[in-house]
């Protein structure tokens, strides 16, 4: 009976460990997607800010330049 109970206990522990690993894996995947989204938004904001400053600088230069 001890051997059977040991096998059952081992299988239960394996199932629980696999489930925990799956949950942790899913959480890490979600966090990775979240970090990727944040980095993408930050890069988009940075590119837009640089573009706006360049456009403002060019238009300011054209305003003071006589044609």
Curated annotation (Swiss-Prot):
Molecular function per GO: channel activity
GO biological process, one term: monoatomic ion transmembrane transport
Topology of this chain in the membrane: Single-pass type I membrane protein
GO cellular component annotations of the record: extracellular region; host cell endoplasmic reticulum membrane; host cell Golgi membrane; membrane; viral envelope; virion membrane
Principal place of residence: virion
Subcellular localization, as worded in the UniProt entry: Virion membrane; Host endoplasmic reticulum membrane; Host Golgi apparatus membrane; Secreted
Superkingdom per UniProt: Viruses
Residues on Intravirion side: 49-67
Segments passing through the bilayer: 28-48
Post-translational modification: Myristoylated. Not glycosylated.
Virion surface-side segments: 2-27
Outcome following mutation: residue 2 to A: Absence of myristoylation. Decreased infectivity
Keyword line: Glycoprotein, Host endoplasmic reticulum, Host Golgi apparatus, Host membrane, Ion channel, Ion transport, Lipoprotein, Membrane, Myristate, Secreted, Transmembrane, Transmembrane helix, Transport, Viral envelope protein, Viral ion channel, Virion
Residue ranges, annotated region (Endoplasmic reticulum retention signal): 2-15
Lipidation (N-myristoyl glycine): 2
Family of the protein in this entry: Belongs to the arteriviridae E protein family.
Subunit structure: Homomultimer. Associates with itself into higher-order structures, including dimers, trimers and tetramers. Associates with the GP2b-GP3-GP4 complex.
Described function: Minor envelope protein. May function as a viroporin in the virion envelope that facilitates uncoating of the virus in order to release the genomic RNA into the cytoplasm for subsequent replication.
Protein name: Envelope small membrane protein
